[in-house]
């Protein structure tokens, strides 16, 4: 390979270096590399907008510590980008600019730039320039000796003048010179002197300690001081530790700053004490702060005087009287004790009056002979004793008055109750209560005067009972949650339960008969014509106006029949309404509506859509019981959860009690009973009630209005006002008027008399037992019975065979599953019966089984008693349990005396009769039903722990043999084997 020489010049030097040129024979061919595909390119393109916003976002921290982005707006991002572009452009122009030569660089040297430039004169100065020069004053610095001399001079001056020195470091320390034990000593201001109780009473740094050592060295610094001579007012005094004698705590720096003593030991203010020592320490503060607060505020708070004051009373006596007044008005052991203040503030008003009365009397006794000099104090204490004298309140009189008229809130009893409460409070009444009592007394005087005048007149010409022009506010019809989008009332579950009313007490209007067949409403003393015929609207205006007139029926004028009174006062809701001149308001033509409930007596009436019945036909109340519309109106105020119980109570309890054509008083009484169960119905609005004095009938207007006009209008518009009729003391003829009746379609409701409530409904023991036997081998029937009448389970205790048959068929387990989430008391009953079946199965004889069942009656009765209940078998179950319980108690007494009461033959006969009844229930089944019962019993075996069989043979074996014989036949081959299998299954 050839070698060549190359020359490199370094200034004037030359350097020659050999080199060999590279061979060009081998050419390295670059390998083509396929371009890589970025898998995230598309994702970055999609997220470019988000990443751009995230690039300029800032980070912020939420209250819960979460870090989040705070994104900029598009306008803010544009401004930021423009700013960055401008900055990059300026930097680019600077980098691309031509180079410049820097000839000189000076740092804090040379002439300032302003002198290198020529100064052009701005004008001619016509005044003499200022010749004064600024003088720089030297900083005065003291040497250590001069500083010590200054401190010494300040100490001498302040100690002679009893002045103060402030030492300012990180915080200010106040040093005061005062005379203590015959010498002037320095004292600092501690925390307890400012009213603060802290474990460390005084804190200072080392620089302050050094100055305190110099300032505390007064003339008698070295004199001996004993700790027993330290008294109150010496707090904060700086003493010499070396000259201090006695029992004292630790200190530092040769200084002892007095704080207080505990158990004879003197403590330094800089020492940290425990909390127990702090609470019981005697601190040596004085009363200067008290007198400072008194002197500083006395002149500012005193009132102006109309004379010139002179000092005529001794100061010491004034101080003694001031202490007497303080203990008479604000008694305390220590004036600075917060516990005494809290106890005083927490006293009831009655106890405070007693305390002030006692202390005012003690203050008068302590004043003694000085009452002639301090006559103003004597007069004040006498007035205080009189004002706080306890009043002897006779609670028996208050209780007697309250029992008589406490529940009466109408005038004048309301005013009497106000005065009764006023007298009970005695001197605790406020000024407002005094004013209310005076107004009540004024109302009583007016009432008595008016009553006397009316008695003298002996007529009702002054009776007025105006009908309010304002409609009642019904919350249930105004709540948005109860209305649909068209502002119509939503019945919800109430609509379903309202069918109990429509199925029993309403009838469908038959279009084939026409509306005219339903126009006449009959009542015991006459008829009333409905406006149902006007549902067919005539298009002729004259004919339509003629129909709007109605059929006028003349009623007698306002008389005593229209009024209701109690204790000589009118009960206005129970009276007929009148006009301003005293004449009665007569009813007008009420137009009909379709499928509406019309409620409201004052103002405009309200139309509520009726609940839907079983069909789309119109419904009308059956002849004779229009009062059921009152309960239908009450259903509006009933919650959906209580709608079922409410409708059942009305159907099973109220309607049987009212009977046919009840009086207004009976209807009001049932409404009062329903209000106890459902308090929300107290303000339920009623339909308009028309009073017919000629026939002594009250008509409840329904959706079909009234064609007959001229009736009086009852003022009662709500349930609470209607209940006022349910009062024997109410003097009223209207309360004896008839209002509607019971439907003819359900006469059986009142056929049975209940021993628990008059006119109620109850199922007999034999009927209930037949119903129970009917469902033992019918799973679907038993399930429905458990849902409708769960207390049928109790009747299983009448027979051990029935009890174990129900257990083996899983009926108790089914009852627990059905009622465990609905009503746990019924689930408890089923559990007790299941456990009872376990114990009964272990008994060998029938008498032993009866004894076990009778002993469990008490627990079952406790679990069954659950207040008022609407189930028909509930009173039957209670009666059965009560009979068994009473029998067990009587038999137990005889058994303990040695006389067994069970007659074996009687028990066997009863059990045999019930067993045959159980067998007959199974015999009535066809082959398929018998197989179904057998299969269900086999499945029920899996859900219970064990299947129980009685040890006495004959009863259940006959049942099993009857089933197998019916299924397989008596002579079928292999029948014995199949019988055994079926017996095991059962």
From Swiss-Prot:
Domain Peptidase C6, residue spans: 618-740
Disulfide-bonded cysteines: none
Residues forming coiled coils: none
Pfam families the record matches: Peptidase_C6 (PF00851), Peptidase_S30 (PF01577), Potyvirid-P3 (PF13608)
PTMs per UniProt: Potyviral RNA is expressed as two polyproteins which undergo post-translational proteolytic processing. Genome polyprotein is processed by NIa-pro, P1 and HC-pro proteinases resulting in the production of at least ten individual proteins. P3N-PIPO is cleaved by P1 and HC-pro proteinases resulting in the production of three individual proteins. The P1 proteinase and the HC-pro cleave only their respective C-termini autocatalytically.
GO cellular component annotations of the record: host cell plasmodesma
Keywords per UniProt: Host cell junction, Host-virus interaction, Hydrolase, Inhibition of host innate immune response by virus, Protease, Serine protease, Suppressor of RNA silencing, Transport, Viral immunoevasion, Viral movement protein
Positions marked as site (Cleavage): 284-285, 740-741
Domain Peptidase S30, residue spans: 141-284
PROSITE patterns referenced in this protein's UniProt entry, alphabetically: HC_PRO_CPD, PV_P1_PRO
Chain positions of motif Involved in virions binding and aphid transmission: 592-594
Entry superkingdom: Viruses
GO biological process: proteolysis; symbiont-mediated suppression of host innate immune response; transport of virus in host, cell to cell; viral translational frameshifting
Active site as annotated: 192, 201, 235, 626, 699
One GO molecular-function entry: serine-type peptidase activity
Motif (Involved in interaction with stylet and aphid transmission): 334-337
EC annotation from Swiss-Prot or TrEMBL: 3.4.21.-, 3.4.22.45
Family under the similarity heading: Belongs to the potyviridae P3N-PIPO polyprotein family.
Protein name: P3N-PIPO polyprotein
Taxonomic lineage: Viruses, Riboviria, Orthornavirae, Pisuviricota, Stelpaviricetes
């Amino acid at each position: 390979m050839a070698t060549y020489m190359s020359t490199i010049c370094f200034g004037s030097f030359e350097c020659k270096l050999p080199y060999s040129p590279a061979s060009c024979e081998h050419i390295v061919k670059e390998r083509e590399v396929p371009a890589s595909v970025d898998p995230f390119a598309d994702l970055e393109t999609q997220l470019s907008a988000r990443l751009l916003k995230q690039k300029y976002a800032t980070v912020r921290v939420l209250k819960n510590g979460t870090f989040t982005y705070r994104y900029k707006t598009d306008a803010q991002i544009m401004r930021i980008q423009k700013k960055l572009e401008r900055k990059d452009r300026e930097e680019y122009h600077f980098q691309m600019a031509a180079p410049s030569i820097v000839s000189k660089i000076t740092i804090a040297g040379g002439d300032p730039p302003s002198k290198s430039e020529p100064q052009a004169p701005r004008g001619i100065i016509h005044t003499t320039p200022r010749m004064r020069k600024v003088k720089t004053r030297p900083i005065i610095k003291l040497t250590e000796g001069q500083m010590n001399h200054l401190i010494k001079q300040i100490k001498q001056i302040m100690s002679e003048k009893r002045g103060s020195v402030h030492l300012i470091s990180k915080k200010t320390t106040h040093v005061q010179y005062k005379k203590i034990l015959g010498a002037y000593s320095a004292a600092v201001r501690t925390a307890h002197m400012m009213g603060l109780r802290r474990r460390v009473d005084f804190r200072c740094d080392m620089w302050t300690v050094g100055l305190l050592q110099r300032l505390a060295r007064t003339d008698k610094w070295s004199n001996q001081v004993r700790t027993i001579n330290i008294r109150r007012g010496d707090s904060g005094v700086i003493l010499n530790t070396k000259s201090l004698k006695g029992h004292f705590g630790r200190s530092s720096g040769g200084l002892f700053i007095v704080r207080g003593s505990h158990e004879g030991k003197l403590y330094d203010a800089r020492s940290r004490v425990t909390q127990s020592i702090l609470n019981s320490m005697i601190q040596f503060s004085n009363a200067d702060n008290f007198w400072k607060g008194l002197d500083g505020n006395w002149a500012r708070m005193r009132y102006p005087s109309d004379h010139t004051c002179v000092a005529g009373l001794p100061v010491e006596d004034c101080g003694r009287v001031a202490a007497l007044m303080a203990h008479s008005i604000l008694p305390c052991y220590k004036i600075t004790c917060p516990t005494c203040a809290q106890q005083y503030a927490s006293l009831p008003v009655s106890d405070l009056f007693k305390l002030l009365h006692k202390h005012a009397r003690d203050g008068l006794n302590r004043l003694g002979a000085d009452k002639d000099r301090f006559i103003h104090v004597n007069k004040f204490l006498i007035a205080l004793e009189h004002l706080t004298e306890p009043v002897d309140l006779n609670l028996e009189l208050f209780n007697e008055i309250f029992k008589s008229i406490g529940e009466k809130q109408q005038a004048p009893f309301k005013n009497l109750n106000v005065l009764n409460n006023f007298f009970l409070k005695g001197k605790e009444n406020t000024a407002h209560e005094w004013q209310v009592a005076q107004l009540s007394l004024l109302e009583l005087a007016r009432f008595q005067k008016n009553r006397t005048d009316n008695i003298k007149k002996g007529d009702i010409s002054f009776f007025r009972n105006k009908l309010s022009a304002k409609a009642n506010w019904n919350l249930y019809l105004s709540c948005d949650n109860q209305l649909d989008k068209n502002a119509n009332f939503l019945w919800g579950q109430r609509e379903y339960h309202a069918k109990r009313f429509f199925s029993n007490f309403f009838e469908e209007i038959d279009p084939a008969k026409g509306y005219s067949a339903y126009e006449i409403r009959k009542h015991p003393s006459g008829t009333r014509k409905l406006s149902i015929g006007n549902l067919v609207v005539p298009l002729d205006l004259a004919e339509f106006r003629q129909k709007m007139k109605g059929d006028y029926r003349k009623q007698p004028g306002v008389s005593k029949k229209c009024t209701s009174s109690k204790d000589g006062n009118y009960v206005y809701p129970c009276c007929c309404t009148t006009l301003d001149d005293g004449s009665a308001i007569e009813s007008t033509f009420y137009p009909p509506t379709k499928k509406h409930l019309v409620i409201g007596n004052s103002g405009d009436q309200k139309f509520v859509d009726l609940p839907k019945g079983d069909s789309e036909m119109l419904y009308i109340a059956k002849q004779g019981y229009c009062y059921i519309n009152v309960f239908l109106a009450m259903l509006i105020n009933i919650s959906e959860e209580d709608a079922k119980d409410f409708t059942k109570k009305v159907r099973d309890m109220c309607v049987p009690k009212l009977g046919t054509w009840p009086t207004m008083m009976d209807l009001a009484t049932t409404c009062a009973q329903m209000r106890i169960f459902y308090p929300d119905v107290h303000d339920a609005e009623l339909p308009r009630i028309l009073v017919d004095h000629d026939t002594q009938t009250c008509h409840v207007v329904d959706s079909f209005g009234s064609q007959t006009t001229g009736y009086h209008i009852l003022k009662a518009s709500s349930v609470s006002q209607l209940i006022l009729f349910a009062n024997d003391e109410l003097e009223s003829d209207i309360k004896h008027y008839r209002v509607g009746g019971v439907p003819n379609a359900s006469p059986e409701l009142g056929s049975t008399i209940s021993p628990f409530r008059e006119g109620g409904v109850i199922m007999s023991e034999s009927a209930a037992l037949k119903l129970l036997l009917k469902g033992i081998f019918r799973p679907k029937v038993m399930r429905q019975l458990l849902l409708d009448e769960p207390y049928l389970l109790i009747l299983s205790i009448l027979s051990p065979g029935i009890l174990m048959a129900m257990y083996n068929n899983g009926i108790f387990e089914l009852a627990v599953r059905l009622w465990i989430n609905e009503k746990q008391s019924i689930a408890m009953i089923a559990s007790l019966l299941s456990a009872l079946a376990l114990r009964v199965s272990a008994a060998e004889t029938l008498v032993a089984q009866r004894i076990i069942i009778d002993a469990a009656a008490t627990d079952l009765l406790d679990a069954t008693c659950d207040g008022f209940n609407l189930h028909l078998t509930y009173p039957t179950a209670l009666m059965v349990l009560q009979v068994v319980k009473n029998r067990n108690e009587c038999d137990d007494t005889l058994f303990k005396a040695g006389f067994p009461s069970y007659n074996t033959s009687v028990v066997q006969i009863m059990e045999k009769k019930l067993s045959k009844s159980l067998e007959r229930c199974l015999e009535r089944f066809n082959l398929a039903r018998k197989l179904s019962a057998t299969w269900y019993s086999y499945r029920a075996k899996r859900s219970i722990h064990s299947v129980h069989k009685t040890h006495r043979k004959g009863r259940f074996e006959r049942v099993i043999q009857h089933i197998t014989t019916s299924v397989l036949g008596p002579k079928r081959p292999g029948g014995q084997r199949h019988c055994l299998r079926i017996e095991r299954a059962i």
